A protein has these predicted regions:
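Active-site PLP attachment segment
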Residues: 228-263
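Active-site phosphate-binding strand-loop segment of PLP-dependent enzymes
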Residues: 152, 156-210
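Conserved PLP-dependent catalytic core of the aminotransferase class-I/II
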Residues: 191, 286-327
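Substrate-binding/gating loop at the entrance of the active-site cleft, primarily
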Residues: 111, 131-147
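Conserved PLP-anchoring active-site segment centered on the Schiff-base-forming lysine
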Residues: 119-138, 159
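N-terminal "arm"/small-domain region of PLP-dependent enzymes with the aminotransferase-like
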Residues: 9-12, 16-75, 206
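Conserved N-terminal alpha-helix of the aminotransferase class I/II PLP-enzyme fold
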Residues: 62, 66-111
């Protein structure tokens, strides 16, 4: 296929996407706190991940900037973490995560997408079976696709099927990994993490990978997610989170044991071969993490307001399977 043929094929596919209502485009919006301005219309923003309002909190932003040492306002790491990009603030954030979660170690990544796309290919080989919920995020699916592991996607939250698969295949693989989200971004339902922990313990050499992207900051007494809420943090082998949603920053992280952390540093391609986040971004994440612990009122407000909206929608005849702030 030459260039012209490829261009024509792309054009035809774009036309088909438009005809089916699936053509994506970048909206020319202006943000104004909780409002969005688009095509001369002012609309309430109900589509962002700024769950606690931190991104639009001008006072919080000013407090951070007022107390920031100008020598730490470094806007580029200029390197990967394995070369010269591993600034001291990385260790500061990872120590705080380790202390908060009471786990052996933590590792910060350039994005949540890099995190999910890189961990599974690093730890899973051809002797590994991945059992993933049907509705896990695209970044997890992409990570599974480029891994050498075999994968079976069990029906969404069908834990009877999951147990059947564990029972059927555990003798045929060196290890198995159960992969799930704690709060599913598509429909807002919550995984029963204690049940998954129970299943993990029942079958030898089975590990549990939980993406808490939509739960960190907003669930649990200290905002550490559903795992904190259900008191099962120690039982989760790879507890993943993001700074890009409730924390109003950028990047991803995993808390795990030290051996797994060291292994990821050596084998995780999306960690090794990418430029580290700017140090000033990590300074902001560190600041927000410390603030987040005490944002219990904000978490309660989010839960109450989500329930009010859900009830209002139900009165209008809409239904929702959500048991979280995602409606």
């Amino acid at each position: 296929m030459n260039y012209t043929d490829k261009e024509t094929a792309c054009k035809q596919e774009l036309i088909q996407l438009e005809q089916t209502g699936n053509l994506r485009g970048l909206p020319g919006i202006e943000l104004d706190g909780k409002w969005i301005h688009l095509d001369e219309k002012k609309m309430l923003n109900l589509s962002s991940n700024d769950y606690l309002g931190i991104a639009s909190d001008q006072k919080m932003r000013q407090d951070f900037l007022s107390n920031l040492d100008i020598d730490k306002a470094i806007f580029s790491s200029s390197s990967s973490r394995l070369l010269t990009g591993n600034y001291p603030v990385y260790q500061k954030v990872e120590r705080l995560l380790t202390d908060l979660y009471k786990k052996e170690s933590a590792l910060v990544f350039s994005s949540g997408y890099h995190m999910n796309m890189g961990i599974l290919p690093a730890i899973a080989d051809k002797n590994t079976l991945i059992l993933a919920d049907k509705l896990v995020h695209a970044s997890i699916i992409d990570g599974i696709r480029i891994s050498s592991a075999q994968c079976i996607r069990y029906r969404h939250q069908d834990y009877r099927q999951l147990e059947e698969l564990l029972d059927k295949h555990h003798a045929g693989f060196r290890s198995m990994i159960i992969v799930t989200e704690s709060i599913f971004s598509m429909d807002g339902d919550v995984s029963p993490l204690p049940l998954l922990v129970q299943l993990k313990k029942k079958y030898p050499n089975t590990f549990l990978y939980v993406d808490e992207a939509h739960a960190v900051g907003v669930r649990g007494l200290n905002g550490l997610g559903i795992a904190e809420e259900e008191d099962c943090i120690p039982e989760i082998d790879f507890l993943c989170g993001t700074f890009g949603k409730a924390f109003a920053s950028m990047g991803g992280f995993v808390v795990c044991n030290k051996i797994f952390r060291d292994y990821l540093i050596n084998r995780m391609r999306t960690f090794i071969f990418t430029t580290a986040l700017p140090p000033i971004q990590l300074e902001w994440s560190f600041f927000v993490l410390n603030q987040m612990i005490n944002m219990k009122e904000e978490r309660m407000w989010l839960r109450k307001s989500s329930q009010i909206v859900k009830e209002a929608l139900e009165e209008k005849g809409f239904t929702s399977t959500s048991s979280s702030h995602i409606l």
